């Protein structure tokens, strides 16, 4: 690694340590796009010149103006005059280059210059990440279905993304936007053809056997071999550019300069990969095109791709679309590369067809010889074919169950000159998600390095247990260190590689290989040192051809029950699961928000041990703990706390394992974190406590660190296994008005002895939201034990109840009604709250009467009885009539207390662990392989969502003491 530079001599710095060599290399070889990851929300044109003058020297400004003049003259002297739009693009690109040199701070810390209001208005783009979802369906889609089915998948994905962001990534709310790019169903003709070829196609009675006989892996291979495939790629590029252009014109995209990520499903991933590769070609390059390609560094948390920028501009071997392949056509030297044409980046598939026809002619020469020679004779015409290119820079590329590995393996077989390095797409990182049982998916890493077939793919952490990641390293350097015996240079000679990649790719420029090695060393201080055990040449050979700095293959959780499903049903099932998977969404958010997570870990007052994914776990303090917690799941809970503005703030949590609190976590560390600024999403570490013999911790917030009026999320994280308990701390001013709801008495329309999911009374959610809209604080109270908190909160979240404070009994109590009365009385006396209205059943009348509430403020759901007729208001006609009465009359009014307390209007998030919502059937997609029903054209308002759902989920009860509902998600509890 000491040899670098264009001449192959010693690198600057000689034998200096690796980090000094990187600093010297950056200072010598830095390009204009080195600081592309800095924020670019600045004005262009005249304002850009003024800002540039204040931040840069006037000589550079003169050079830019002269350069623009030279470009204009050069274009005027050529055969074709440069249009005004092209010249304006060149001017804007030069301005961008000068502005990048200003080295603006990272996102979130940009300073406002003296430009004031004008500059601020031009920096106000709220979208930081644009996710373009290329949806082409699975390999069995016929393409004749309803287009709204694809839109339904995107809607599902968007809703899951929003819920996960609200629960664990609140800083990303409003800054990530999803756009849908429909892709043609390129496998439909291949599926029709193969279906007619199977031995059972003549027998309609054996339809199931006929479908199972379809070779699913052959469908994408046939699809990409079709001459129409090139048109499909061009269509995708055109649609993506159109949608991106419309986005820039919209209110969400004006001034956008963030990162653009691509998400491709089974078919869309194939088209997206080739579209990225075509976009990396040299055709149509402008002087600013090198910065375009270099823009992928804006989303990379390491400088690897920044250093690649110059190589991206100068090397034409970054993708399969512009690779020198050995010709198989007769009358040509097979060792001589094909002559490069001016626009060969847009004619790769035409050359591939030529090669493929020549390959077939060796087998069927009498039939295909003329066809194989015809394209070769018409080669000059092929150079005129143009597929276009993306108008944006691709940062991260996510694949959902794509057979890209099979396609690239076939291309490597037909065109032996292609290897993994030359097929590298122009993006900073590729992530390939798949289920191990998915017949459509395949791995990519063994194509880039054959020895990786012995390395298992990265297991995506389960969102239910590790919403912020489980701490496993995704860096390639760490994987090379962990499996270093596999990648030693001597050991790799024994097995025949899938790709005949040399020890150092001769096609790549020398400086590009050097920068790849240096960037690998500087990507992570630990990983660079950990890979020292691997031979430097072996490590550089692998990293030089890798598609980023992290692992590529990621395996999702796959239930064993899927092995019993018919093979033909699996593509539809797995394809639907990606859009519903919280595991996938959380993983994507962790990758695209790396700048935010880095700033969180570096901020003062934060606990890096509890939040850093690089070191999330510690050893248990007691050796017995690991044995006690084997084969049991966490059932932690922390009580919601209400405190007066000038009173003590005491946080209480209990850490138990097992559904019935069979095991208590005793004598172990628990980190206490609070989100002091909920809008920022940053967790502040308060302290670390040790659990007592009953698994409890009680923490009194010190007076200097007490929080002001507001609602603050609280998280208590177990150091040993990173399980956590979520709650809220609410600090109220004196005289805060509240509305109390008894969960079982006022919301549940059915009583289940076996504990299955209770029905919700129609209109209950609307009444609660009515009081919330008026500014009242919502108090949910129940006599159930606190061990059921996760189940109850999940039930409230499933039915879209508004956010509020929830209170349970402390364990199993003999008289829960008495506990309710004591608790509410303490709130009124110690926190000085005022109860404006109280809802419940007839059992709760005594509780509310003891508190001194008049009959006009007690609302009981159910039939009127003479015994209690004078003590309460009966809602015999249901919540709908009651809500109409509240809105029509003046029985409900806005709260009168201090306006300093502004409550967040919303519903319960996903901090309630979704595994408590699981029920009997985890695979809600049917085997009929139908897409989900599209969303209604006029969706119901949010209030209408409170109507009870179908009773189809109430057929089979769960064990006792469980409130559960099976959401339409694919995942199941491991």
Swiss-Prot record:
Key words, A-Z: Calcium, Lipid-binding, Membrane, Metal-binding, Phosphoprotein
Gene Ontology molecular-function annotations: calcium ion binding; lipid binding; phospholipid transporter activity; receptor tyrosine kinase binding
Composition bias type Low complexity, residue spans: 520-533
Membrane topology: Peripheral membrane protein
Biased composition (Polar residues): 312-325
The protein's name: Membrane-associated phosphatidylinositol transfer protein 3
Complex formation: Interacts with PTK2B via its C-terminus.
Keyword Hydrolase (UniProt): no
Function description: Catalyzes the transfer of phosphatidylinositol and phosphatidylcholine between membranes (in vitro). Binds calcium ions.
Alphabetical list of SUPFAM superfamilies matching this protein: HAD-like
Lineage of the species this protein comes from: Eukaryota, Metazoa, Chordata, Craniata, Vertebrata
Species whose genome carries this gene: Mus musculus (Mouse)
Domain DDHD: 390-594
GO cellular component: cell body; cell projection; endomembrane system; membrane
């Amino acid at each position: 690694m000491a040899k670098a530079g264009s001449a192959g001599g010693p690198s600057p710095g000689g034998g200096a340590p690796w980090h000094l060599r990187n600093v010297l290399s950056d200072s010598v070889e830095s390009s204009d796009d080195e600081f592309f990851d800095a924020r670019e929300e600045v004005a262009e044109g005249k304002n850009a010149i003024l800002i540039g003058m204040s931040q840069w020297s006037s000589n550079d400004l003169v050079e830019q103006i002269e350069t623009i003049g030279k470009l204009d003259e050069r274009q005027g002297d050529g055969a074709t005059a440069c249009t005004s739009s092209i010249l304006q693009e060149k001017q804007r690109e030069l301005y961008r280059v000068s502005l990048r040199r200003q080295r603006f701070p990272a996102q979130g810390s940009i300073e406002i210059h003296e430009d004031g209001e004008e500059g601020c208005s031009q920096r106000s783009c709220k979208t930081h990440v644009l996710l373009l979802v290329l949806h082409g369906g699975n390999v069995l889609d016929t393409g004749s279905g309803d287009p709204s089915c694809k839109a339904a998948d995107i809607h599902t994905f968007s809703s899951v993304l929003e819920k996960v962001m609200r629960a664990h990534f609140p800083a990303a709310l409003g800054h990530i936007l999803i756009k849908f790019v429909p892709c043609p169903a390129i496998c439909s003709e291949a599926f029709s053809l193969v279906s007619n070829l199977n031995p059972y196609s003549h027998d309609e009675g054996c339809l199931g056997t006929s479908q199972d006989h379809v070779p699913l892996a052959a469908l994408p291979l046939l699809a990409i071999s079709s001459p129409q495939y090139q048109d499909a790629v061009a269509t995708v590029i055109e649609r993506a550019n159109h949608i991106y252009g419309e986005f820039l014109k919209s209110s969400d995209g004006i001034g956008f300069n963030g990162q653009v990520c691509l998400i491709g499903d089974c078919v869309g991933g194939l088209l997206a990969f080739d579209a990225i590769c075509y976009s990396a070609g040299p055709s149509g390059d402008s002087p600013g095109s090198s910065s375009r390609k270099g823009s992928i560094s804006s989303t990379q948390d390491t400088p690897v791709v920044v250093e690649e920028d110059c190589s991206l501009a100068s090397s034409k071997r970054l993708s399969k679309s512009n690779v020198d392949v050995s010709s198989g056509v007769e009358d040509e030297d097979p060792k001589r590369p094909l002559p490069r044409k001016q626009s060969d980046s847009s004619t790769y598939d035409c050359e591939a067809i030529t090669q493929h026809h020549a390959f077939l002619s060796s087998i069927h020469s009498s039939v295909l010889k003329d066809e194989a020679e015809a394209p070769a004779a018409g080669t000059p015409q092929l150079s005129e074919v143009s597929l276009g290119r993306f108008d944006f820079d691709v940062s991260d590329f996510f694949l959902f169950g794509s057979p890209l590995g099979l396609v690239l393996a076939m291309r490597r077989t037909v065109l032996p000159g292609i290897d993994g390095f030359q097929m590298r797409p122009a993006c900073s990182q590729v992530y390939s998600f798949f289920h191990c049982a998915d017949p459509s998916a395949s791995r990519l890493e063994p194509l880039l390095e054959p020895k990786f077939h012995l390395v298992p793919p990265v297991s995506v952490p389960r969102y239910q247990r590790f919403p912020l990641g489980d701490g496993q390293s995704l860096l390639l350097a760490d994987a090379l260190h962990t499996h270093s015996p596999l990648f030693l240079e001597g050991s790799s000679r024994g097995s025949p590689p899938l790709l005949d990649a040399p020890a150092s790719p001769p096609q790549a420029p020398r400086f590009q290989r050097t920068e790849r090695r240096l960037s690998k060393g500087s990507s992570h201080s630990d990983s660079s040192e950990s890979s020292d055990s691997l031979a430097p040449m072996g490590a550089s050979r692998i990293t030089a051809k890798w598609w980023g700095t992290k692992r590529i293959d990621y395996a999702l959780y796959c239930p064993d029950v899927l092995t019993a499903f018919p093979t033909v049903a699996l593509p539809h099932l797995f394809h639907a699961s990606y859009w519903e998977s919280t595991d996938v969404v959380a993983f994507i958010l962790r990758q695209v928000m790396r700048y935010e997570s880095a700033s969180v870990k570096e901020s003062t007052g934060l606990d890096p041990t509890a939040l850093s994914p690089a070191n999330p776990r510690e050893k248990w303090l007691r050796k017995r703990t690991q044995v006690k917690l084997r084969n049991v799941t966490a059932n932690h809970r922390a009580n919601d706390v209400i405190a007066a503005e000038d009173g003590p703030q005491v946080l209480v949590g209990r850490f138990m394992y097992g559904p019935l609190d069979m095991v208590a976590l005793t004598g172990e560390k628990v980190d206490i974190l609070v989100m002091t600024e909920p809008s920022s999403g940053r967790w502040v570490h308060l302290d670390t406590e040790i659990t007592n013999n009953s698994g409890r911790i009680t923490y009194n917030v010190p007076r200097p660190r007490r929080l002001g009026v507001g609602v603050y999320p609280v998280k208590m994280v177990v150091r040993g296994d990173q399980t956590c308990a979520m709650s809220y701390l609410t600090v109220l001013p004196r005289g805060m008005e509240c509305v109390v709801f008894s969960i079982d008495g006022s919301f549940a329309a059915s009583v289940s002895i076996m504990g299955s999911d209770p029905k919700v009374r129609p209109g209950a959610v609307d009444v609660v939201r009515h009081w919330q809209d008026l500014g009242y604080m919502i108090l949910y109270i129940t006599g159930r034990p606190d061990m059921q908190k996760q189940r109850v909160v999940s039930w409230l979240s499933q039915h879209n109840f508004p956010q509020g404070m929830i209170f349970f009994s402390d364990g199993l109590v003999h008289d829960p009604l008495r506990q309710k009365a004591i608790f509410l009385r303490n709130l009124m006396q110690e926190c000085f709250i005022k109860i404006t209205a109280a809802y419940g059943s007839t059992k709760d009348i005594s509780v509310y009467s003891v508190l001194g509430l008049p009959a006009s403020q007690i609302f009981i759901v159910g039939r009127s009885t003479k015994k209690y007729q004078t003590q309460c208001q009966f809602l015999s006609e249901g919540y709908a009539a009651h809500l109409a009465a509240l809105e029509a009359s003046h029985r409900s009014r806005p709260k009168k207390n201090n306006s300093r307390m502004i409550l967040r209007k919303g519903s319960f998030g996903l901090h309630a662990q979704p595994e408590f919502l699981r029920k009997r059937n985890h695979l809600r997609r049917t085997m009929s392989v139908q897409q989900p029903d599209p969303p209604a054209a006029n969706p119901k308002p949010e209030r209408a969502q409170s109507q009870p759902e179908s009773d189809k989920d109430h057929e089979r009860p769960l064990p006792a003491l469980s409130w559960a509902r099976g959401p339409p998600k694919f995942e199941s509890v491991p």
